[in-house]
Amino acid sequence: STNSTVAAEYTAVRLECALDQAYRGVKYYKNNLFDSSLALQDGNCNNDVSSSIYDAQCISTTIYAIVIRNVTRALHETLWQCRAVPVSGSDIQSNCITLQVKGIS
């Protein structure tokens, strides 16, 4: 399923992935391309990413979020998704989130 998040340009926006089971690692994908700067190293919430562009947050054992600090028009219609390595079993994928930038068509 795909959710849509709308944000104004030059603001911060939080995109939240809900995963249906506990994980030990999360990778973020933008437009189906893995961004290595957004990989969570473990499921203990110890290695959250923080940079000038993104702030990745482990909220609970099944919810993970990324904050894009400064939304730009280049991010309009981008598709975001978490792919997680669960505690047991095969990889799981979260909901997909399409980012809409307000005022840009």
Residue ranges and their predicted role:
Residues 5-6, 43-90:
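Extracellular beta-strand/loop-rich beta-sandwich domains predominantly from IgSF
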